[in-house]
Amino acid sequence: MKTLGEFIVEKQHEFSHATGELTALLSAIKLGAKIIHRDINKAGLVDILGASGAENAQGEVQQKLDLFANEKLKAALKARDIVAGIASEEEDEIVVFEGCEYAKYVVLMDPLDGSSNIDVNVSVGTIFSIYRRVTPVGTPVTEEDFLQPGNKQVAAGYVVYGSSTMLVYTTGCGVHAFTYDPSLGVFCLCQERMRFPEKGKTYSINEGNYIKFPNGVKKYIKFCQEEDKSTNRPYTSRYIGSLVADFHRNLLKGGIYLYPSTASHPDGKLRLLYECNPMAFLAEQAGGKASDGKERILDIIPETLHQRRSFFVGNDHMVEDVERFIREFPDA
């Protein structure tokens, strides 16, 4: 049995930025995940369920667990003195860590994806993305350090809190998964170099918003529902409403996750920096693809911290089909 800590040290030589700092940074995220796992499992017994009454930078009501997870991850990262600052879906601006000006890395995160599902005991997750800073080491980080395209990521991953808690990450050398053993307090390697199955058969989208979708996406949904033995259709529809949980299932079983633009969210709803980029990095490392319908997600130059984007991620052939339908059936 190999633990996450042992695996990270063993694989350091495989990526170009192999340093003790990055290893320690991933260990800090691991610690934060353990704390969140512990408290999610007793959320109904302590007063951390439901809405907090506050709103985040996008005007969305924050759940109590959103704020809890954000603070625990932030504290775990700051305690190691290896991160110069963070950007979070739950923070209006970047958070500069005082006394960490010589740290090389910045972290972007969605502390608790799908948190509205907590009240009904559905899987949720944590998403993280790691970059090397671009401003001079020894100075405080600025927003410039965070507004980097996804193809500059050093590492990315997610933690899914479900029937078991799993941490999945990449440093650009494959995707690896670890299951948390609460009796030992360690994450243990369960899958190395994960890949999407060759053919996907599941599509994940909130079809309740069908009337609001672009024409190309509507056509693709109909394509998924049509019977065609040569392409193994119809596909199966599965949608949890938690990006991490939907992505994780599709990574294991094969499929595509779709979150297109709508009339109320013309730029899409998912955040480029906190959700799209890290999941796109993981998808490509697992042999999949990620797109906004027209452009590779990892090539998009971000303009603002909380920028949104349409998002299609999963098996490469399925994402390519969506792109084709969007090209062929543009909105009037």
From Swiss-Prot:
Its EC number is 3.1.3.11. GO terms for biological process: fructose 1,6-bisphosphate metabolic process; fructose 6-phosphate metabolic process; fructose metabolic process; gluconeogenesis; sucrose biosynthetic process. Belongs to the FBPase class 1 family. PANTHER family: FRUCTOSE-1,6-BISPHOSPHATASE-RELATED (PTHR11556), SEDOHEPTULOSE-1,7-BISPHOSPHATASE, CHLOROPLASTIC (PTHR11556:SF35). Keywords: Carbohydrate metabolism, Cytoplasm, Hydrolase, Magnesium, Metal-binding. Pathway: Carbohydrate biosynthesis; gluconeogenesis. It comes from Shigella sonnei (strain Ss046). It is an enzyme of class 3 (hydrolase). Pfam families: FBPase (PF00316), FBPase_C (PF18913). It catalyses: beta-D-fructose 1,6-bisphosphate + H2O = beta-D-fructose 6-phosphate + phosphate. Mg(2+) 2 binds at residues 110, 113, 275. Substrate binds at residues 113-116, 206, 239, 257-259, 269. It is found in: Cytoplasm. CDD domains: FBPase. Gene3D superfamilies: 3.40.190.80, Fructose-1,6-Bisphosphatase, subunit A, domain 1. Its cofactor is Mg(2+). One of its GO terms (cellular component) is cytosol. Homotetramer. Mg(2+) 1 binds at residues 89, 110, 112. One of its GO terms (molecular function) is fructose 1,6-bisphosphate 1-phosphatase activity. Binds 2 magnesium ions per subunit. Its main location: cytoplasm. It comes from the Bacteria. This is Fructose-1,6-bisphosphatase class 1.
